């Protein structure tokens, strides 16, 4: 008799996705982040659900309700700290996952890559509206500054901003709708993740060499289930260490002050995972230009497949491209640092140069490096 997991309509889908899935035998730990992101999403949805049971989305009580969760709800402090730091873990895994995709040429699976970029944007939107909910100073002013950017859109900008606010400033209506968005978006993300996996399983995973892996595949279970569990334990240890020993390490002290529309914090800045994009936004001394650069900093990922000029898929055997990749990584770290600094010299100039080099490396230097490497690999004798 055939095993039920191979015949039952639902079990068959699970079996073909997580058990009998043919997987390249040589994928490294860089391929662990997909499963870690799945776990992060589940952790965020579960902790978020329990937080939503005690949170009130009203300007008068939102801040107090978060304090109430931390003080009076059983393990509320832990649930809140896991949720807040879980977002940081989520983005850390996301950035490493995208970086892996760029390094090993995973973007050549265009459908998987494109839905992945849309997922990244959706997760960023979810994190932004979520950050507004505790209704601290940085929540309020972050919401005011970022939503105000839409007013740079010609003709419809001002109307659009007031429509999103539900009034003439960030107020009760804004908080209520942001809570609604923050509740629904993770479930939309979950559906998109299924589509992401669907596209991935059409082609199968790539591998570090960039060569066709079809000649040597192994079943996902037990090999990669065990490998994923190891990665999962490491991530959980880091997350729990953060949540229990230094839960406020990555937060902003200003958010411990209730929102006050009459008092602007000296430095308005988002959470660390948005700082690179915020630095690019601030480096352009024009509102509309800054907004376009901000969008371009993420949307540039969509054109990466078109900029692939190399005859090899992976960067594993391409030292010039590797150097550029690590320059890009260092550049993003510099942008993240600059995004958290005040708008004064020398930070302004550093931010502008880092923003220029970010786009230059991706759009100009990487395609040129691919062409140069192709030329260097050509036999020079008849």
Swiss-Prot record:
Residues at which heme b b562 binds: 83, 182
Chain positions recorded as a ubiquinone binding sites: 201
Binding residues annotated for heme b b566, in chain numbering: 97, 196
SUPFAM superfamilies in the cross-refs: a domain/subunit of cytochrome bc1 complex (Ubiquinol-cytochrome c reductase), Transmembrane di-heme cytochromes
PROSITE patterns in alphabetical order: CYTB_CTER, CYTB_NTER
MF-aspect GO terms: metal ion binding; ubiquinol-cytochrome-c reductase activity
Keyword Heme: yes
Gene3D superfamilies membership: Cytochrome Bc1 Complex, Chain C (1.20.810.10)
Gene Ontology cellular component list: mitochondrial inner membrane; respiratory chain complex III
Cited InterPro entries: Cyt_b/b6_C (IPR005798), Cyt_b/b6_C_sf (IPR036150), Cyt_b/b6_N (IPR005797), Cytb/b6-like_sf (IPR027387), Cytochrome_b (IPR030689), Cytochrome_b_C_euk/bac (IPR048260), Cytochrome_b_N_euk/bac (IPR048259), Di-haem_cyt_TM (IPR016174)
Details of cofactor binding: Binds 2 heme b groups non-covalently.
Alphabetical keyword list: Electron transport, Heme, Iron, Membrane, Metal-binding, Mitochondrion, Mitochondrion inner membrane, Respiratory chain, Transmembrane, Transmembrane helix, Transport, Ubiquinone
Top-level taxon of origin: Eukaryota
Transmembrane segments: 33-53, 77-98, 113-133, 178-198, 226-246, 288-308, 320-340, 347-367
Cofactor needs: heme b
UniProt function note: Component of the ubiquinol-cytochrome c reductase complex (complex III or cytochrome b-c1 complex) that is part of the mitochondrial respiratory chain. The b-c1 complex mediates electron transfer from ubiquinol to cytochrome c. Contributes to the generation of a proton gradient across the mitochondrial membrane that is then used for ATP synthesis.
Similarity comment: Belongs to the cytochrome b family.
General remark: Heme 1 (or BL or b562) is low-potential and absorbs at about 562 nm, and heme 2 (or BH or b566) is high-potential and absorbs at about 566 nm.
Subunit structure: The cytochrome bc1 complex contains 11 subunits: 3 respiratory subunits (MT-CYB, CYC1 and UQCRFS1), 2 core proteins (UQCRC1 and UQCRC2) and 6 low-molecular weight proteins (UQCRH/QCR6, UQCRB/QCR7, UQCRQ/QCR8, UQCR10/QCR9, UQCR11/QCR10 and a cleavage product of UQCRFS1). This cytochrome bc1 complex then forms a dimer.
Name listed for the protein in its UniProt record: Cytochrome b
Gene (UniProt): MT-CYB
